[in-house]
């Protein structure tokens, strides 16, 4: 494989080594030496994931305003759902009416860079580029050239109801055994409601399930010679899957076939005590749009406003992921698209994101991230992390929902852990080696 994709250990080391990193000498979004772009009468189309709409829409709007003031061009932002965005992107890229800017997860980006879906970018034009996190910038680079720009990183944490913990005489758990003990106590105290979940865990939440797998020493797949083999059938991986499935069975509630896309909204209904989610979802559980179908409607407090906090999930390593932004090769507005990315990823935008409990795209900003109230748990969670297999076709595994289907088969009882893992291994190997 020609991609230089940073491994999880390198990303963790990058995060932990922030104090040793200096500032950037790169040309920034306020560079006045660059020739001004005239975008009057033009509109660029930006595809961002729904996270930005629900958690930091004001950051998007600020970048749009600064971009329009500088170029005269307008911006149309279309928010995408994680569940189907790759299928939609593939279909769109096959035609000519393509988005100018596309957000992809850092595990998804390599396939599209390798296939030529994104245009080459001048790395020096983006602020803090000398200090980009390797786990985000690695998937952007091919043969010494840059094809996307790091957007943000994040780690998952334990989100919990402070009022329910206090009523049960509990403190934030510091070991996995304490997590289970807390779940038992909360279930005993609040279990009269069939809707109550001591620990809400969607059954198709593969980022969570694979974290439990890694906690037991397992992994998803490994390279054997020149072939990939699935490793979910190995004893450690099965132990992690079983431990996770037991959590779902004993402490969750509701439709076990769901994924995590709306778990913050479900937690906000007030019937759950614990959740495993992004640091920024602490805020998403407490304020939501008055009209869920109108992203411009006012934010209103939920039932759990002021009753939610976060802590590192003890004993469970976090998937340390994030997103990158690319300019479509078929875009007719490549210069303007790159300019928009410049504003959306500059220091002003990144510092605004810190308040949302996400990690910035550059090491020189990490000290500021750790100092932001509410970001402490996310920064600590990043110290124990894992990453997906470094396979060029990994995005195809995600697109086919292989892990989600395997997990649904387990939690619905359709298959045993052993049988589901064997099926998953076969599908993963077939996809990665195809």
Enumerate the language-model features and the residues they cover:
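Hinge/lid segment of periplasmic solute-binding proteins
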Residues: 38, 106-155, 180, 215, ...
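Short, solvent-exposed loop/beta-turn-alpha elements that line the ligand-binding surface or hinge
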Residues: 38-40, 123-134, 191-192, 197-199, ...
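Extracytoplasmic/periplasmic substrate-binding proteins
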Residues: 49, 109, 242-332
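C-terminal capping/gating helix-and-loop segments adjacent to ligand/active sites or protein-protein/ligand interfaces
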Residues: 356-360, 377-427
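Extracytoplasmic/periplasmic solute-binding protein
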Residues: 147-150, 156, 180-229, 265, ...
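Glycine-centered hinge/linker elements that transmit conformational signals in sensory
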Residues: 183, 227-256
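Conserved N-terminal structural module of periplasmic/extracytoplasmic solute-binding proteins
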Residues: 2-12, 18-111, 123-128, 256, ...
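A structural signal for short loop-to-beta-strand junctions that line the ligand-binding cleft
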Residues: 99-100, 128-164, 197, 308-317, ...
